[in-house]
Amino acid sequence: MSKFPSVRALDQLLDDLGAGAARRRQLDMVRGELNRALERDALPVGARRSLRRLLEEEALGPYVRLAESGTLRHRRVEGGLPPTSEATNEIRRRCVDLLREALGMPALRLGGGEIPLQPAPEAGTLSALARQLDQYLAGAMSPAQTRLTALLAVELDTAGRSGELAVLRTNDLGKDNAAVYIERHPQGGGAVEGEWIETSALTRAALGRWLDVRKDLVQRAHGTTRLWVSLWMNHDGVLDDDGHTTIRPAGMPLEENGLVTSYRVGRLRYDGLRQLLPLKLEQLRRAVDADRQRTAT
């Protein structure tokens, strides 16, 4: 907990905002930088006590300049504190405006410009991807390819964000995998909305193949209801006092980072996917979402 009342009030605001997982990580970055800026006495004294004063231009101007210089990084990069990237700078500005708007303050748009969205696949590419996945299902697949095929099929039906897909559980699937329940978490915050989405024949078949693989994995790990699970033994990444970490067996819940990594690796590993999948899962999501909206009109 921060020693500054303004940052403690910011923590409460972040909890109430209900932002999606990706946006929350970005907001937490800004929160940490603001706290470090206050610890350096780099902001006006009033910003220590009042959240509104912390989010006024008098405090945010110096904060943004200091943060962009790299001085407020929470860890060193190759022994130094280099300036943050333009993409990070733009994320920071967006988060600042989001926080101000949550308090009823107008957006500042402190310098910089919008980072253009990476291009999303066309509708024809989505159809070609579905055909490629169907070809995979017609033959033998490794566990990793089976999981990725099911994940991509679900994405083509739902246009789910990575965080929304990662938290899916087996009880979010309808009878015979004919539907999937997904909770929408708006990136900028707002009410969470859930919906049942009818699945395609491709998705039903892909989920059936994956659930057979998943069953054996989960039994070894003593059970979980999470839909996506790990395929290999790994560790939790937390070191104890002796420098050791807890070993996790295969079949443990796959977190969002692991899900995104499986997408990136699979895009390069399996024949046909590099030409059909964009670099990032989010680009695929936007393409599917746009296609769904076109179909609905």
For the regions a language model picked out, list residue spans one by one.
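Conserved hydrophobic/aromatic "anchor" residues
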Residues: 13, 33-34, 99, 210-213, ...
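Short, basic (Lys/Arg/His-rich) helix/loop patches that form interaction surfaces
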Residues: 249-297
